[in-house]
Each structure stands twice: as structure tokens, then as C-alpha cells.
Amino acid sequence: METLFNGTLTIGGRDQESTGFAWWAGNARLINLSGKLLGAHVAHAGLIVFWAGAMNLFEVAHFVPEKPMYEQGLILLPHLATIGYGVGPGGEVVDTFPYFVSGVLHLISSAVLGFGGVYHALIGPETLEESFPFFGYVWRDKNKMTTILGIHLIILGIGAWLLVWKALYFGGVYDTWAPGGGDVRVITNPTTSPAVIFGYLLKSPFGGDGWIVSVDNMEDIIGGHIWIGTLEIFGGLWHIFTKPWAWARRAFVWSGEAYLSYSLAAVSVMGFIACCMSWFNNTAYPSEFFGPTGPEASQSQAFTFLVRDQRLGANVASAQGPTGLGKYLMRSPTGEIIFGGETMRFWDFRGPWLEPLRSSNGLDLNKLKNDIQPWQERRAAEYMTHAPLGSLNSVGGVATEINAVNFVSPRSWLACSHFCLGFFFFVGHLWHAGRARAAAAGFEKGIDRDNEPVLSMRPLD
């Protein structure tokens, strides 16, 4: 237990002496006060939703329609655009009002959650078990804990189905692969084949396989949400109506801190997946809104110079580069025709502006000579100058690259931030899992505070 250093610091039964935790231990003081812990969680949800609403309106207020979203440091409007709000052909923003509505709805929701959080933190009952037994719980009540797990799963499943309904019945979603450079379309034939959907999970995460990050069409994305939403709803019902089996009761640690550690591990995994998805995937994260991926920017540069030099009379099929390999085109390890030069490392890149120029044997020479469309040239030139090179605390671009635009790509920011957050959540998982296991084993004594510097410091008040 924590050592008391200021006996006057008492707050409604949540003082250090009665709980074993000091004020800075936060919600640990509320482990046995279900009503107050509810208040803390509802208030936390209110803060999250407030940020979403406020940041949403901030982005709307600063949005410049003439510039691409990814050049303006936006991270919320690209998501709203991806699910089909306010955009038209080619990802052009045609109406910002839906974005404004989204921000206002989130702000209103945050006010409701904020009121509920303050109410339960200050006014509501300290514990729920007596007044509202349905919402009350004991951490060691295994049946109640799995019931709560089930309720959470059902809510997550409904969330997945909301995207499905939006894609199928409420205006559709933005599909970067729509002919002519992307458009909003209704998904009429989502993939429901378990072989396809679960095939992604069985793929290798390495190389060109890419696990679930390799998804490259909206039908599979929406079909995946049908599967995950349905499984979560049925899994939730299962956990509500059943009791944990004997092996599960023995295998898990059943305490508040253990559940915290499980949750942190789950969020950590989701953070790492989001990191990879936002960095590599240009279907769930359309390049029109989030900017090109690294391989995409590289391939688009090779394509842009191929177009330029071909117009100047170069024979792009036979020109040699300084290494003796093809300057513009060469063969991949599997015999396909690919772009030559440094971008050969990204030979398995797939993008909606490039795929029309392929045939069964890679890039089609006849199409490259006769079929390149103006929108493909414009898209490639734009992506070439917007490689995702910035980091969390830097400007973008390369100092020696005269074609680079100085900006920080949302892909850089989202990938870097989610990796960092995923890592810290994983460390939090290890910390709380270790404490929970030690407490369950009976040798958790806490940290020795006898010689802690804070003991000799002046009290806060």
C-alpha cells in the first residue's frame, strides 16, 4: 500500500488512508466505488468526444477547398470524407456542411457526457450495487464480468454495422478505386465469403502479403465489417447468457487491475494495426484525402518522368539507366514489367491511378504509349511532390529535393502517433498485468515509500 504523507488530503472517502492510493493514482482510488468510477469513465468519454467535436470544427474553420486535405494538416475531415460525406468525383469537397454538423453533434454529445460525469463524480451514489444492482458489480464476480464484456462486444458490433448500413443504404462510401479517379458509391455486393475475409487473417504480415493491411477493395472492407459486427454481436450474447468455463476461470486473473491490463493490451494491438493500416493502405485511407503512401509517391515520380521523357522522344521500353538496368521499365523478380530505377523496390505497389495501365504481365507497354489519361498524369505529379516524409515534430519534405512540398502528411502523423501510443499502451499492459498477477499470487506489497523524496517536500495545500 502507498505510504501516507499528508493525512489532511481527504476527499469524500477517497483519501489515501482509506483507499491505499494517493490523489495522483487517479482512478485506483475508486476501485471499490463503482458509482464514482462510473463518473470518471463518463467524464473521460465526454473529454474524448469534446476533442472530436472541437477539433472537427477547428478543421472546418481552417479548411481551404483549393488545397488537398493532406496538405492542410487535417486528420478528422479525411475520415468523414472517406465514409462519403461532403465529397464527389475525384475526392473533391463539394459541401462542408456535413463536417460542421458532425462537429456540432459531437460537442452536444460531449456536454451530455460531461454533465453525466460530473453528476456521478460529485452527486450520484458512491456505489451502484445497492441502488442499481443491474449496474453494480464485484470485480471477482466472474459471471458479471463476462456479462459486461458481452455488452461491450454488442456495442462494438453495432458500431461495425453502422459503417455497413452507411455503405449499403445511406449514400455509400468513398471508393478510391471507382473508375476515373474515385467517387462516392453505394456498395451493392459486399464480400461475405469466409474464405476471402478470413483469408486476410491467415496471410503473412511480411512482404507483399500484408495480412489484413493488404485489403484493396471496398467490397472486402464492408464485408469484413459485416463479419466482425455479426461475430461481436453473437459473441456478446454468448458472454451475457453463459458463465465462464472452468479453464477460463483458472487461466485468467479476475481483478480490476487485470481487466485494465487486458484492455490496454487490446488497445495496444489496435494501435499497431492502425499504424500499419494508415501508413500502407490506400483503400481504407484514400490517398486523395490522406496523401500518397511512401511507395505510391515513389512510383508516381517514376511514372511522371516516364510521361515527360516519352513526350520528349525517349524510347521508354529500351532506354538503359546508369546501372545497365532499364531506366524507365524493367522486369520484376516474377517477370512482370515494372518501373525501373530506385522505385523498383516498390514494384508490388497497387494504386487506382496506375492499375488501368497494367495487363496480365505487369505494366502494358502499349497502354503506356497510347492510353495514359490526363487525370492519371495530374494525380501522379501531385503525389510525387507530396511524399509522406515528415514526422511528429518536423516539417515535411527533403532539403535536397526541389520537387518536395513542405508539409507533414497525415500518414506520417497517424502512423507515428499510433505506433507511439500503441507502444506506451503495451508498456502499461505489462505494468498492470505484472501488478495484477503479483497481487493474485499474494506477494504484492507495493512500492517502499520510506525514503521517497516526496516525504520531505512541503504538502501541496
UniProtKB/Swiss-Prot annotation:
The modification N-acetylthreonine is found at residue 3. The keyword rRNA-binding does not apply. Keywords: Acetylation, Chlorophyll, Chloroplast, Chromophore, Manganese, Membrane, Metal-binding, Phosphoprotein, Photosynthesis, Photosystem II, Plastid, Thylakoid, Transmembrane, Transmembrane helix. This is Photosystem II CP43 reaction center protein. The lineage of its organism: Eukaryota, Viridiplantae, Chlorophyta, core chlorophytes, Chlorophyceae. The keyword Methyltransferase does not apply. The gene is psbC. The modification Phosphothreonine is found at residue 3. Belongs to the PsbB/PsbC family. PsbC subfamily.
